[in-house]
Amino acid sequence: MNRQTWFVTGAASRLGADIVRQALARGHQVVAADADPLAVLRRVGDAADARLLALALDEVDAREVGAAVQAALARFGGIDVLVHGAADSSPQSEFDPGPPPRDFSASVRALFNVTRGVLQAMREQGAGRIVHLVPAPGRQRGPTLFSIAGFCEAVAMDVAPFGVEVSAVPAHQAMALLKSASGSDRDEVLQEA
């Protein structure tokens, strides 16, 4: 098995922490980024594990994202997988057709920032995988969901020649797959995402 470096945002969430634990259990190195890195350590465990780097990250701040990516590169030498929780969980019934709400703008800006943040390293490596986890359509504002899907599709076409794959995966599917998979099946599930 090749050791990879995973960059996981929203790492203190239930799904984020599970992804971090599974990647570590498979021998990978993980940058676990969240607004509260101490919560990551509480959920994930061993802060002494040299393969785990827990970082504070506001994904909306491009400079913070750049600094987190640089910290990951300095510590591990590359980034092979980005798993980003691109979520705006406001109900569709609360959609306001006026100016975009802050949470919509923040979700889309975070999506752009983390993708742009890791792409240079992945291009230079000639490989990488970017997975944006999105909420189920019924729990997600349509404009945010379609912004994420459209962005992923466009970026996937742009970066395919560099060996970088991009996908959007419903978070509930990722959670169900991780719960149902065991042993080597979990490796497959994580790679399929």
Identify the meaning behind each predicted range.
Residues 96-112, 123, 127:
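Catalytic Tyr-X3-Lys loop
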Residues 47-63:
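Rossmann-fold cofactor-recognition segment
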Residues 26-41:
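Conserved glycine-rich Rossmann-like NAD(P)H-binding loop of the short-chain dehydrogenase/reductase
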Residues 68, 83, 114-118, 151-152:
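Hydrophobic positions on the long internal alpha-helix
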Residues 49-50, 71-84, 90:
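A glycine-rich helix->loop->beta "capping" turn
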Residues 9, 79-87, 107, 132:
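Rossmann-fold scaffold of SDR-type NAD(P)-dependent oxidoreductases
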Residues 157-193:
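SDR active-site lid
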Residues 12-13:
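Conserved glycine-rich cofactor-binding loop
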